[in-house]
Amino acid sequence: MKRFMDEDFLLNNQTAKVLYEKYAKDMPIIDFHCHLNPKEIYENKKFRNITEVWLGGDHYKWRLMRANGIEEKYITGSADDYEKFLAWAKTIPMAIGNPIYHWTHLELKRYFGIDEILNEKSAPIIWEKANKVLEELGARDIILKSNVEVICTTDDPVDTLEYHLKLKDDKNFNVKVYPTFRPDKGVNIERETFIPWVEKLGEVYGKKIESYDEFLDALKSRAEFFHSVGCRASDHAIDNMVFAEASFDEVANIFKKALAGEKLTEIEVAKYKTYTLRFLGKVYSSLGWAMQLHINALRNNNTRMFNILGPDTGYDSINDGHIALALVKFLDSLEKENSLPKTILYSLNPKDNYVLATIMGSFQDGSIPGKMQLGAAWWFNDSKDGNLQQMKDLANLGLLSRFVGMVTDSRSFLSYARHEYFRRLLCKLIGEWVENGEYPYDLEALSRIVQGVCYYNAKEYFGF
């Protein structure tokens, strides 16, 4: 029997061990999509205890605690930090087969030097040991300990990017922290957040926005500002992919209706979103950015809890909407104008992997290797099986060797352990192919593939 999570964890063959130890393990990390707070990075935020750094904002863990029958008081409620930690320690032994079980113990090992298994019995000593380490370990220290080279946060176009600018000028921190342009509030015209957001956009643009023309000019201006601060990618939450052709004048009238507080029809919303996303796609192409589309999430399912806790608190799920036709029309509309940017496609529904991977193949070109990317296993798919399946699907239909690799997509500074988890799975998979006689044992070629997926592909793709 193998030891629990030893140095060969997940590396079930000799080739995998060689590839991981010699070529994957020590590669720097480019985390091109995450939700870390740049203010906390700049200030080297210190955490009062392991509960704050581990459980604060981590809806992955919250979902497991709820599934284990833990009262909300001990998850997001009024219980003290130690009580919340004990509730997590009570839950994690039940998580057999769940990636969070592995991530939890990788994080304990890598950041706190703790090899004990977390459970109710070990919780008091782990609490003491981890909190002792955290006295000297701030946000920057965790990042440096993780061998991170680039971090791309997720930012609203109305953000001032104050802390990105401060980090850019900070000579004592050599990790690059860049913004990512996420204009969802300006795309989702049907939501009540739209009008207040347009007002905020006007404030940072320096001019009250009263027309669609001015709105588009302001979006472009903000994209150019983001570019000057190092932004090289956008990100869009496309929960339902739509496509509906419309003229500029038609969409301008829809925009005016929305600003006047009038209710829009479903087709009007689709026309507005289509025109606005196409405009943004052209802007991204002109700037040389990558456009990330996160598709098929079903958010805020539990109305009662949404009203209490708000979004991003663990009440989302996979959607099963049809995406192929609208997505193809959208990409093709940009391609026809020679304005299709580099694009990374993620779907929360794993059934869409083959759909996305074959759509990608229709829009690859000679401008850059892997211009169209199948994004890493996202959110509910970020597991042992989910990562392996995503890589197998990509390999079956495209070039795994050109994959830009893993992202944390996380709000936790400790989540860089997931890059190790991913790299071990990558080496396991490639090692199995080699040992099954499906690819030659050519370390020159294999090392190039492994190091490309772990680091070089993303570095070249984004131009970091």
Swiss-Prot record:
Disulfide bonds: none annotated. Keywords: Isomerase. It comes from Caldicellulosiruptor saccharolyticus (strain ATCC 43494 / DSM 8903 / Tp8T 6331). NCBIfam families: PRK02925.1. HAMAP family: UxaC (MF_00675). Its EC number is 5.3.1.12. GO terms for molecular function: glucuronate isomerase activity. The gene is uxaC. This is Uronate isomerase.
